[in-house]
Amino acid sequence: LDLTSGRDRGRLYRIAPTGWKPRSVPHLSHAKTADLVALLEHPNSWHRETASRLLFERQDASAVDGIRHLLRNSKSGLGRFHAIGSLEGLNALTADDVIVGLKDSVAGVRERAGWASEKLAPSEAVLDTLAALTDDENARVKMQLGFSLGEFPPSETRREALQSLLAGSGGDRWIRTAVFTSLGTEASDAFL
């Protein structure tokens, strides 16, 4: 087998049928901020991720209201997911935004909101909403909840939420690991 065979003939980049015309690639770097916000719920991942990156790079505060509207009203779970990250990237994420995300019908959005909640500790309203998720049906949400609760200062609400997570983990080692990571020196209290 000659591995150098064909080296003098160039490289094939695309095989396409005769008459096929490639679609144009959008130049999102020239897009208006409002258009980038709308792209956060685009079905194509490249559009969503590029729009999110450009919003972060621009740090345009005029995007915040549109992103907040998207978080609360988008029919796209991926759009709501990216809205949380974009608000966080613009340093505009509030406890109300996180609570909206934690109450979302899509598990991935709840998980992302749980992660974002860590920056808002010690918000009591966020802690109470996190504590209400201990019986969530999604294991990834529960695991993130276990980690996120560790960022909040010790309290009765936090301890009870971690105990509830541990009791309802169904033997899931990842959830248990998250809970024990958050308990730290309070681990003995969880068993009393």
Question: What residues fall within each predicted segment?
Answer:
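Long, ordered, helix-rich scaffold segments
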Residues: 2-192
